[in-house]
């Protein structure tokens, strides 16, 4: 069964644009407003980060957003309860470290997620080899477990991950944490083109994407981008009009590969 997320991300003409926000940054009461704003801006899907005290993959902007949310006592359960009443029509994706999911309980987590518009799950600190901790609970659901793929992964490992991939492949474009960047690894284009050649699902580039030029660059070699730190920072600074314009332009970028 092709997951809803894969169908929504697949677009042969325009780059898929997935945005990231930290759940509860600015207060849980603002979450629905943020989601509806991003949906109106033309994005394909929205990742919602779950605040965690030891966010190993997060750069400084997202770490600060997580701290702001934690100070407001925001939890995974509180976010899922809020999402259960969301009116958003595009797919949502939960990005959480494994600890908050364990704390809530995997069966309860999956049960709660199915009552929301969430169609994807990213767990950055859950290695591919340990996915069976959660995949039995996800079987038969419309929730895609999205793999994170690093630049340094050997080809055999990439093939194995691609074979099992759901939703889309999250191709990490840098060696390091999230954050706004000006430069990417010189081998990134070759890496993405190879991933696209072996993947049955769309391939999206993430970590460091922060300009229309970046979106255009990646539209030549993969199916779209994930934009995180820039979105988090602009929402925090209340630059919604500027952010909305940027995202609308990004969503109009044509795929050239």
From Swiss-Prot:
UniProt catalytic activity: (1S,2R)-1-C-(indol-3-yl)glycerol 3-phosphate + L-serine = D-glyceraldehyde 3-phosphate + L-tryptophan + H2O
What Pfam families does the database record attribute to this sequence? Trp_syntA (PF00290)
Give its E.C. classification number: 4.2.1.20
Q: Which GO terms describe its molecular function?
A: tryptophan synthase activity
The protein's annotated pathway: Amino-acid biosynthesis; L-tryptophan biosynthesis; L-tryptophan from chorismate: step 5/5
Please provide the record's keywords in A-Z order. Answer: Amino-acid biosynthesis, Aromatic amino acid biosynthesis, Lyase, Tryptophan biosynthesis
Location of the active site = 47, 58
Transmembrane helix in keyword set: no
Does the UniProt entry include the keyword Cell division? Answer: no
GO cellular component, alphabetical, reads:
cytosol
Return the InterPro entries for the record. Answer: Aldolase_TIM, RibuloseP-bd_barrel, Trp_synthase_alpha_AS, Trp_synthase_suA
Source domain of life is Bacteria
HAMAP family given in the database record: Trp_synth_alpha
Indicate the family of this protein. Answer: Belongs to the TrpA family.
Q: What does this protein do?
A: The alpha subunit is responsible for the aldol cleavage of indoleglycerol phosphate to indole and glyceraldehyde 3-phosphate.
Which NCBIfam families does the protein's record reference? trpA
The record's subunit annotation is: Tetramer of two alpha and two beta chains.
Q: What is this protein called?
A: Tryptophan synthase alpha chain
The organism named in the record is: Listeria welshimeri serovar 6b (strain ATCC 35897 / DSM 20650 / CCUG 15529 / CIP 8149 / NCTC 11857 / SLCC 5334 / V8)
User: Gene behind this chain?
Assistant: trpA
